Amino acid sequence: LLTDWYLNREFTNSELRILIDGLLFSKHIPYRQCRERVEKLEGLSSQHFRARVRHIAALPQNRPDNRQLFYTIDMLDEAMEKGRQVSFHYCHAGMDHQLRPQMNEQRNPKEYVVNPYQLVAANGRYYLIANTEPHSNVSHYRVDRISDICLLETPVKDPRQVQGLEQGLDLSQHMAEHPYLFAGESVRATFRAKKHLLNDLEDWFGPAANYFHETESALDVTVKVNQEAMFYWALQYAPFVEVLE
């Protein structure tokens, strides 16, 4: 009989709950793979903890079914570590809810050759920040829509040769300027917002937002942001936002 022994777990219950909730709220992980990883995390906990997370059984099944997701992430990590290009097919959903690759003019799956620079999580999904050959601008790809990825021998293009990345990739600035991960140029936008949106403004733009002309009910805001993203952001808050320029 052993005495004076105790189990020191790697994660506290609250840390495990945060990790599990992160999986539950991630929209890009297929249902089966999500459940498998939740069960792995549960295995790191006590029976007492597992009894307290019954909400896991309510995991919705209306998730994407790209079972290549984790392989894709591994390949992108390897490509970025080795500084090499990748090729892949990029999928779109059909009316039957299935993902199918985009086709070229010959009705064959279109092959994208891409210079991968960074993986980011935004709006509950994984995105790849990249450059698509032979173009010179920044591209954003939903990782859960990438299929049939291959690691190429070609060295990755220097990001300083990519329009918008001439000074390198400043990730915090890039994310502030591209809240919806649209590609394209960033512009300086000024809009008037109701003051009750201040928390939302901080969530979306953070320190990149410049506030001025404050009144009792509204304030003016200037941000540098992707033009198309600004259009959709303003639509989302249409009753409370007026774009000035």
Give the label of every model feature segment:
Residues 5-103:
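Bulky hydrophobic/aromatic content
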Residues 77-139:
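Loop-centered beta-sheet repeat module
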Residues 119, 149, 211-212:
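A structural signal for short hydrophobic beta-strand segments in well-ordered beta-sheet cores
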Residues 134-171:
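Flexible linker/loop signature enriched in Pro/Ser/Thr and Pro/Gly
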Residues 169-245:
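Polybasic (Lys/Arg-rich)
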